């Protein structure tokens, strides 16, 4: 999908990859970019529409869906990542509330609009969905769950004309990764690669050098083949 003249919603748009995605969408000619944040965002470009949106707040989600109406692309970027060792169930619940249920709730709320526009859902995930990083265990669990959710949505929505993309990021220079002393890709380059993958209709997008090193083996691997095979059960059930 090309972004020119499209209406887009980016959650978690105040900083990091989310803010970079807003800027890149504008560069690529988006008609309107709704910037979903818990605290309203100010922006110099009139195409940016600030939107108060906490992805764990059902009332705000419903209000956003009503206010926006027609939508071409939903980018589920809002997330939380904290260090933990799975000893505190409240910590796991917090990560799941934002990183998993946030994606689920936003996607369900905007599905009618996306189906009508034959649009796209872009879920910003992480390579820890494939192999957990134990120092951020709850984050890893939530992203693995969100990846499975993404694959399941993909199977059900392909026949309705909605593309569902998983963005499996490696280390990117954001506040979430500030404490990690490792090489990081820039937010701007990640945003460019994400939209490049969307425009090229890549199901799974690997937007930085670390994640890109896994792309070929993942796309041609047995697990990806099984995903496609399992998706056929949906098509068979509807036949």
Question: Where on the chain are the PLM-derived regions?
Answer:
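Conserved glycine-rich cofactor-binding loop
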Residues: 14-15
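Conserved mid-core segment of classical short-chain dehydrogenase/reductases
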Residues: 79-94, 135-138
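Active-site helix of classical SDR
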Residues: 96, 107, 142
């Amino acid at each position: 999908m090309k972004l020119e003249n499209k209406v887009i919603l980016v959650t978690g748009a105040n900083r990091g990859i989310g803010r970079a995605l807003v800027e890149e969408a504008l560069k690529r000619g988006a008609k309107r970019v709704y910037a979903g944040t818990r605290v309203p965002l100010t922006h110099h470009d009139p195409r940016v529409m600030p939107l108060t949106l906490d992805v764990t707040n059902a009332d705000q989600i419903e209000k956003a869906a009503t206010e926006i109406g027609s939508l071409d692309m939903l980018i589920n970027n809002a997330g939380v990542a904290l260090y933990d060792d799975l000893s505190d169930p409240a910590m796991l619940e917090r990560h799941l509330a934002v990183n998993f249920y946030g994606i689920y709730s936003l996607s369900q709320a905007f599905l009618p609009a996306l189906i009508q526009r034959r649009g796209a859902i872009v879920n910003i995930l992480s390579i820890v969905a494939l192999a957990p990083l134990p120092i951020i265990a709850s984050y890893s669990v939530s992203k693995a769950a969100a990846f499975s959710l993404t694959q399941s949505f993909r199977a059900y929505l392909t026949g309705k004309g909605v593309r569902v993309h998983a963005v499996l990021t490696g280390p990117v220079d954001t506040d979430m990764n500030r404490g990690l002393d490792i090489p990081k890709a820039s937010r701007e380059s990640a945003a460019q690669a994400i939209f490049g993958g969307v425009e090229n209709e890549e199901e799974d997008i690997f937007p930085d050098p670390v994640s890109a090193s896994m792309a070929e083996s993942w796309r041609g691997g047995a697990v990806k083949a099984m995903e496609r095979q399992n998706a056929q059960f949906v098509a068979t059930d509807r036949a």
